[in-house]
Each structure stands twice: as C-alpha cells, then as structure tokens.
Amino acid sequence: MVVKTYPLGMVGTNNGIAENEGDSGLEPYVGLEFDTAEEARDYYNSYATRTGFKVRTGQLYRSRTDGTVSSRRFVCSKEGFQLNSRTGCPAFIRVQRRDTGKWVLDQIQKEHNHDLGGHIEEAQTTPRPSVQQRAPAPTKLGISVPHRPKMKVVDEADKGRSCPSGVISFKRFKGAEDSDGQTQPKATEPYAGLEFNSANEACQFYQAYAEVVGFRVRIGQLFRSKVDGSITSRRFVCSKEGFQHPSRMGCGAYMRIKRQDSGGWIVDRLNKDHNHDLEPGKKNAGMKKITDDVTGGLDSVDLIELNDLSNHISSTRENTIGKEWYPVLLDYFQSKQAEDMGFFYAIELDSNGSCMSIFWADSRSRFACSQFGDAVVFDTSYRKGDYSVPFATFIGFNHHRQPVLLGGALVADESKEAFSWLFQTWLRAMSGRRPRSMVADQDLPIQQAVAQVFPGTHHRFSAWQIRSKERENLRSFPNEFKYEYEKCLYQSQTTVEFDTMWSSLVNKYGLRDNMWLREIYEKREKWVPAYLRASFFGGIHVDGTFDPFYGTSLNSLTSLREFISRYEQGLEQRREEERKEDFNSYNLQPFLQTKEPVEEQCRRLYTLTIFRIFQSELAQSYNYLGLKTYEEGAISRFLVRKCGNENEKHAVTFSASNLNASCSCQMFEYEGLLCRHILKVFNLLDIRELPSRYILHRWTKNAEFGFVRDVESGVTSQDLKALMIWSLREAASKYIEFGTSSLEKYKLAYEIMREGGKKLCWQR
C-alpha cells in the first residue's frame, strides 16, 4: 500500500481519489505506507479532523547504530495527564521506517476515552494535503485544500528592492495587497507558499515569528541533491523538538523551506502546533547572530546546533576563537565539500546565538574511524602552552600503528557543554560508533562529557597531564621516593601487586594524608598501567605517551592565514606516510627468524610493523620455560618464567576445547597481539597455527576493507554505501599511484581495470 500526499497548498490532480479504492476510506490501518513521517502526521491530522479530535506529535525512537529516527508516534492531544485538559487518552498511531526509506503504520489504537467533537477545524493554519491510497474495494475520497496566494518577503512598498541576505525589515511585512487588491496574510504569520531570497531570510523570519508567539528556534535537518550534493531543503524547528535533552519534549512545530530553480526558497511544509506552553514576547536570540559570524549564510552550511545545555548555565560563555575564523573556515569547508561529498562539519551556537565550537572531518577520516576508531585519543595539546588556536584533534591508530586523523575541532571554551557538544557531534559524524577506549585529559568538564556521551568507554587520562601534575606535586620529594614511585607504576604486573606496592610506599614515607596522592590513587583505574591492561588501547604505548598528529607544525605562533595550509600539509604528509607503509607491506618480504609455521602465517597476514612486533615476541618466547601447574578436564594452567630470572613469571590458562588462552600479562587484551608467554605454551602444546580469533583484522594488510566482513553488524544501508564509496575511492587512489609509476605498470593496470569492469557489468 502506498499513500501519497502533496506539498502544503497544492492539490493532486486526482484530488484525493484512491487507486483501487476500497471501503476503508480515510480509516488508518496497519500496513499503510507513507513516503515520510511528515506525510504520516499530515494524514493522521486529516483523519483526526474528520473524526473530531486533535493530534500531537508523540515519542520518537532512534536507531542504536547511527542515532537516526526509526519510528514515531502521533497521539491524541488528550494523551497523558500533564495538563488539566488531558485525560490520558490511549489513541495513537505509530509509523516505522523501513530499509527502503518508506514509513509504515505498524501500531494503532483507535479508541478514545473522551467524547469526540465530530468534524472540527484544524488548529494549525496549514492547509491539509490531499491523500491518495490503495485499498481493496471502491470508494471515493476528497479533501478540500484551501489555496493561498504566494507572497514574497520583499514587499512592493519597497519599490522592488531585494532584501539583503541575513537582513529583514519587518515593517515591510504588514499585510500587503496583491495585484487583485486582496490583502495577503501578514508575512509574520508563516504559511505554505511564502517565498524568500535566501535560507538566511527564512531563518530570521521564523525566528522573529517565534519571538512573537513565544518559543525558541533550532536549525534542523537538511536534504541534499543526489546530483550535485547542494542543499535542496531545510527545516527550522522548535527548540523543544526531539528528546536528546531533558529540556526537549518532542514538539512537532516546524517550518520547512525548499530551494526553487530560480535560487529562491519557498515554505512547502509547516506545522504550527506545539505540545508545550508558549511565552509570547520571549526573546529568541538563538539565531540572530549567525549571519554576523558566518557570512556565507545557511544556503550551504551543513549543521548549526544550538546547545540546549547552555540554557542551564550562565547565558554568556567565553569564546577563545576569534570571530574572524568563522567565515574563513566556512569558505574552506564549502570548498572541501564541493570536492568531497563525505565531508562533514558543524558549528555550535550558544544561547545568545553566537558561534562557538567548530567540528569537521573529511570522508577519509570518517572511513578511517570505521576501521580504527576502537581506541581514540582526544588530543588537546594546545592547552599545554599559550596557543592562539584552540585546535583539538580526534586521533586513532591504523594497522601500521601510525596516528590517523578522525576529525578536527576548534574548542570555544573548556566547559562541559562545549566538550559534550563536540563529542556528540563527532559521534554523529562517525555514524554512532563509540570507541572502546579513549585517552583524554582529566579535567572535570572532560571527564563529565566523556561519561555522558561515551558510556561504557574506558576513559584514560592523558600522560602529559599526569606528568605535569607529578612534576608539580612531587618536586620536593627525595629522589629515592621518585624511584620507588616509578617502580610501583611500571613494574607492578597486576592490580593487587600495584595496590600492595602503593600502600607500602605511602606508609614508608609517611604520605598517607597527602591530598594529591590520595586523589590520584582513587582514580587509579584511569591512569595506572596495571589497571588499563584489561582494556584495548591498540597502538598507544603502555605509559600513555603519543606524538601529536601535527607535531610542531601547528603551534602558538600559527596565524589564521597559515592555519589551513599547515593543516592540509600536515594531513597530506601523514597520509603519504601511510601510503608508503601500505606499499612496503605489500611489496617487501621480511626475513623469517624461525622455522615455526606461525611465523610464516603472520608474515603473510600482518603489516610489516605489526609482524615485527609479533616476530620479537616469538623470538623472546625461546628464552622462557613453561611448566604445567594444573589440569582439570579441558582446562590447563601453566607457569611461564624467564630463564635466569625467577621474578619474571606469568600464568597462562588454556582451554583445549576451543583453544582459548589468556595470560596474566594481558598483552592481547591491551594491544591485540599475542604475548611471548602464550606463544611459549602454544609451542609446548604443538599448536603450529594461530586460531583466527588471535589475529585481529585491524592489524592485517587488508584492514582498510574490514567493513566488508561486518555487513550484518547493524550498519544501515546508507552508512554501508558511504563506507563502500570511501573505501573504493581510497583503493582507486592507491591503484592510480601504483599504476602510473611506469608505462608498463600503466598498461597492466589499465588491462586489469578493463577486465574487472567487464565482470562488474555481468555481475547480478
């Protein structure tokens, strides 16, 4: 079944006559299909008007994979008990989004617990759409749709002068007369058909209307052309739309504008009904300053998010980003988006409408996150010194253990609100994929933001900040204490061993009451190596140190003029280093040091960097002795100790039923690579090939194509297509690079590509 609805103010050519008409008429039923959730709401509004009740937009549900809306409820206005006029009415419909993009009515309750009023006028002034539907038997339907004349924002009283972008004179919107002498509706009252010169004008118009009516505005969803990627429509919504924050309550009020062929914009959908109390005359500063800060306007900007959290703190937040940065960066973002359709950027607004933090990531960074986003560093090295640019980066580590950029940001201020917005935006750009572990500073705002946005992610404190605190708080302590302190941190193999050594240390030097030592001990699971080994931090050194992605190329002396060029140069340099390692891993063959089949197996699969680490562990395993200390059924335990060093020993547990092995050193849990102790036990048990579970795909030569093995993990079809596009583009880039190194390679590459093209054409 398909239901078609027309844009507001338009009438279908069949005027709502059903195809294969049936006696169901306008009665909703399970299986009814719509193109969009808005069409489902308009349809239910029409049914409600005929039946005698009003509709509110109810709860929505989001995908756990990517955060997109997966289903919506539209309820009787008397649902719930929050207001005296409500009676807890159970009537509702629920529509669910299918993989095709259609919305299907899957739940319904028609019974009301109150009297119905017969045919009533809709509370909103939006014209009702005509409806076409397919049903089993013949009946004719017709809905009268009032027509309203179109009206331009620019009034004839201004003698045809166009309204400048981002500037509106509301004196020109007072009930003008059209050529027939009929008074048009006031432009301060939005309606379908209202025209604007730009998206900026529409935004400021709706914001001014919101001030009069008494609500705040957020810039909502946008839609892009499949042809050229340009923005074709935008939604402006009530600030209480959605449920992502306690201040929001799923309000359905919005205005949508659509771009015309002429370049202008027209209101094509509208809902004026709110599900909350309004405050007429309420100042709505949320959007006023956007065109001052971002001169490029809304016609092309991707996402501008008003941070609701700022409503609960001081209305003014300091901003360390110079105002001149916004237009320059926006121009850069738009130029990047023209050449890279996967380029993502977002700008945060505070409660006064001022531009705050900025986030961006290109398609390669977004694709890299799908492969190497399991362990992430939020690098705020700019906080170490007097940096003029508050530039932060999200860093992952690839299959060569090289840092890869997963997104960049300018941080307006160091508040919980700023970091929460930044983490949420990064998560949105990365299709909702949360990291297993994250290295970030220990300041309270960052701790709170990580806990809020990344529940279940192991937050590890930045090593540079721990070192800085140690220098500050331990400088007056004797060298003997510092030596034992370092030994306690880096030589304790288990959490029990660390706790014992720490207790002995503070007692020995009479530091039981030292406030700083007590504080960091209470947070030991976030920075002590023994407490971190059970979590995966692939590529990050055990002491937590790492080299900043941009090194010293971006520093306290970097000016606005130099920032973008240095950013691009640093990014290209890192990616060139990755390409070189890819080439070496595929074309260079490291020497084998043993005759063990596991060494040949791992040489074939791992990248050069990872294989060398494995090869070192395998070689070291010959310096250890293994002794079975316990056996019951399929479970065995081994004590593995180093020859000539009784103190260096570890316990390995092995299950013969599934070849599972675990070691007390927890190297596999932390790095994703088998340790020398397990390799020793495998050698004793004559296991000549590593089980596949111990060769993580992220460390192999083909790691960049890992998503192909993960198609059924809940990734949406849209995200999967984006991943495939990004992956093929990257593969094509490397293919071109290799194929153009000589004329012979070019001929071979061209022939391979042509043959591959033939296979693709015949593939069904």
From Swiss-Prot:
GO terms for cellular component: nucleus. One of its GO terms (biological process) is regulation of DNA-templated transcription. A zinc finger (SWIM-type) spans 650-686. InterPro entries: FAR1_DNA_bnd_dom (IPR004330), FHY3/FAR1 (IPR031052), MULE_transposase_dom (IPR018289), Znf_PMZ (IPR006564), Znf_SWIM (IPR007527). Expressed in hypocotyls, rosette and cauline leaves, inflorescences stems, flowers and siliques. GO terms for molecular function: zinc ion binding. Residues 119-144 are annotated as: Disordered. Residues 42-118, 204-280 form the FAR1 domain. It is found in: Nucleus. Its main location: nucleus. Induction: Up-regulated in hypocotyls by far-red light treatment. Residues 375-471 form the MULE domain. Pfam families: FAR1, MULE, SWIM. Keywords: Metal-binding, Nucleus, Repeat, Zinc, Zinc-finger. PROSITE patterns: ZF_SWIM. Belongs to the FHY3/FAR1 family. Putative transcription activator involved in regulating light control of development. This is Protein FAR1-RELATED SEQUENCE 7. The lineage of its organism: Eukaryota, Viridiplantae, Streptophyta, Embryophyta, Tracheophyta. The gene is FRS7.
